[in-house]
């Protein structure tokens, strides 16, 4: 399996396009390779947010949604939209899983512990989903509910938890079924990099009520943390009011709908082979409900089970006998594999995967290059091996460093990426390969919000670039959306896209002049 001129699809995570140079780390960075391509190579802009990627109108894009749409070549109704619709049409309040759990807890006189990200961000969760759960508990006259709230500050402004708490308290006046028993920044509760030292104090708080920090109410705690320059994301695990830890027979409901940052905390309760840290206690739960499927190996009761997708890009390449490589650093590995394959765990025939470890630093502005140099070396070796027809890679820097809100560090990250792109193209050129470059959503092109007068750490709703390097082809449309990438890539390979792919082919071969 060799002598292939490889086609590389490079996904620059969080690299959006913004005409406005102000607060734009991409525009500020010195990017000779990118600038040369932008002036000389075919390129267009793609929509990567809202309705074109199965999200509510004007909702910013995110990595999971972006990669699913790049890989699927069709609009997929996202879990966020599915759950919103279920709330609006009354199906949420009739969900059999919720009713079964509450009925069982009423019988046994045990408690329901609802945990998740209290946020209007719509990336990992939405607070309206929590509010709908409270309304359902009230409708069923079930009042033994304890809330364990994770704070955002990453997909929302860094200090915005008080706004969400105000909305929650208004709901608790209407539906007086629950008490807030703990708060914690997502940095701890929603780690996805096996940094168990972050997750352990969250687990101890949830299962033993143990915390170095205790306050009578959530607002007092947050005011204290803000005074000490600790924003929402980094609030340490904190006990609120009277201790109500998770006991035998209780049920846990995790209302995050996005899987990647829910898996680790879920595994502390459910993984029989768990080795992250020593669990002093392991409650025997009656149920662990997850809003969606977090991992096929974590046996949760799923409120909104997955809808399977057929004929994603990976499957089509495999069925045509082509070899493919997926490569990313830890932070985005799930995105180029699980999410790119439509939320499917299985690996296709002739699909290989390489994960380059992400650096172990507290926040990525401390190492803006992340593991891009190592990733580039590995990618170049794969290109030179000529073992793969298609290589799908992700560079995490623009997104992960952009999330820190540190402008200068994000500029450094972009400059590092430009050098990496240059090196990758030299290897591709030497092997007769082609390069498609795009992004899953915006981030680094807008680093400060004048509206909130805070760093803009969240994703944006800006379009993303779609650039072709390799000659012989041109774009036929002035703009597109992420679902057009897979059909266009297949066209470059001479493969007709399957009927499931409703995205358009945006590239056409140049006609030879007679």
Swiss-Prot record:
Names of required cofactors: Mn(2+)
InterPro entries tied to this protein: Alkaline_phosphatase_core_sf, BPG-indep_PGM_N, Metalloenzyme, PGAM_B_sf, Pgm_bpd_ind
Residue sites binding Mn(2+) 1 per the record: 399, 403, 459
Residues binding substrate: 124, 154-155, 186, 192, 258-261, 332
GO cellular component terms, A-Z: cytosol
Any single biological process term in GO: glucose catabolic process
Active-site residues from the entry: 63 (phosphoserine intermediate)
Pathway(s) annotated for this protein in UniProt: Carbohydrate degradation; glycolysis; pyruvate from D-glyceraldehyde 3-phosphate: step 3/5
Domain of life: Bacteria
Any GO molecular function: manganese ion binding
EC number, as in UniProt: 5.4.2.12
Keyword Endoplasmic reticulum attributed: no
Catalytic reaction equation(s): (2R)-2-phosphoglycerate = (2R)-3-phosphoglycerate
Group of enzyme by EC: isomerase
Family: Belongs to the BPG-independent phosphoglycerate mutase family.
Function: Catalyzes the interconversion of 2-phosphoglycerate and 3-phosphoglycerate.
Description of how the protein assembles with itself and partners: Monomer.
Protein name, as recorded: 2,3-bisphosphoglycerate-independent phosphoglycerate mutase
Encoding gene per record: gpmI
